[in-house]
Regions:
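Extended, solvent-exposed segments with strong compositional bias
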Residues: 86-173
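Short solvent-exposed strand-capping/beta-turn motif centered on an Asx-Ser/Thr pair
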Residues: 54-59, 195
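Membrane-embedded hydrophobic alpha-helical segments
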Residues: 1-25
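Acidic, serine/threonine- and proline-rich intrinsically disordered appendage/tail regions
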Residues: 156-168, 174-183, 187, 195-249
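Short, solvent-exposed loop/turn segments enriched in Ser/Thr/Gly
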Residues: 44-50, 183-185
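Low-complexity, acidic Ser/Thr/Pro/Gly-rich terminal tails and inter-domain linkers that flank the onset
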Residues: 17-43
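Short, hydrophobic/aromatic beta-strand segments
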Residues: 59-68, 78-83
Length: 249
């Protein structure tokens, strides 16, 4: 008996290691800590959200974080992937508040620890992204053509808004505008280690007043090249939404 106990004592660390490696499953959890922020600008529609990722039992290497937004009424989807990590701590440079960001990349979450993530996403719809690039390239050329040395900023914007290109692009963007008055579901997918995934579903809604204000971002985005020339900020509507777990209802 003493010999068996001694052998078990020697084997115990190895048994624990084998158990941890092959039998204990990783449990990954996403805990929201910031509101969902909705955007529309020259990059189109996208979101920003923040939280912490918790890994239980084993360390996990997060390979990707993706989001799919679904508009409930017509099931229109907005596919997004992580683009950058935005540090949510304001710093002051020359008296002006600034934030810092870095390109999104895989990271490791140690077992039993919490890893904060504040992610800005970008559309993965390459066809739509290419079209937006074409539109704003032509708008930039239009601005160069209409600018006059004695123009005020309002005169420049009014002249731009009166051009055929501007009106056609505005109508096109209004037609394809994603953020409408409706209910939405966000499917957050975290890919970790090799090909394992964990999904979370949240919901929010946009009311008629918010949708109308959001549509104003189209004209502001088309005219922001003029703002840049006159060095004035472009104030875009960016509503924030609480994380509400989607119960399927």
């Amino acid at each position: 008996i003493a010999t068996a106990i001694a052998i078990l004592a020697l084997l115990q660390p190895w048994i624990i290691k084998l158990w941890d490696r092959f039998f204990r499953k990783i449990h990954l959890n996403f805990i929201p800590t910031a509101k969902i922020k909705l955007y529309y600008n020259r990059s189109g529609a996208y979101v920003y959200l923040g939280g912490v990722i918790e890994s239980k039992n084993k360390a996990a290497i997060v390979k990707d974080i993706a989001v799919k937004v679904i508009r409930k009424k017509d099931k229109a989807e907005l596919p997004l992937d992580w683009s950058s990590f935005v540090v949510p701590v304001f710093q002051s440079v020359g008296g002006n508040p600034v934030t810092t960001s870095e390109i999104a990349r895989p990271f490791k979450v140690e077992s039993g620890s919490l890893y904060p993530v504040f992610v800005e996403f970008v559309s993965t719809n390459t066809q739509e992204n290419s079209r937006l690039a074409e539109i704003y390239s032509e708008i930039a050329a239009e601005i160069r053509n209409i600018m006059q040395p004695n123009f005020t900023i309002e005169e420049a914007k009014n002249t731009l808004a009166g051009s055929n290109n501007y009106r056609n692009f505005r109508d096109e963007l209004l037609q394809s505008f994603y953020w409408r008055a409706d209910e939405y579901v966000i499917v957050l997918t975290i890919t970790y280690n090799d090909t394992k995934t964990q999904q979370y579903r949240f919901k929010f809604n946009i009311d008629a007043n918010e949708a109308a204000a959001f549509k104003g971002n189209i004209e502001k985005s088309l005219q922001c090249g003029v703002d840049e020339i006159y060095r004035v900020p472009t104030n875009l509507f960016c509503p924030q939404k609480e994380f509400i777990v989607d119960d399927g209802k």
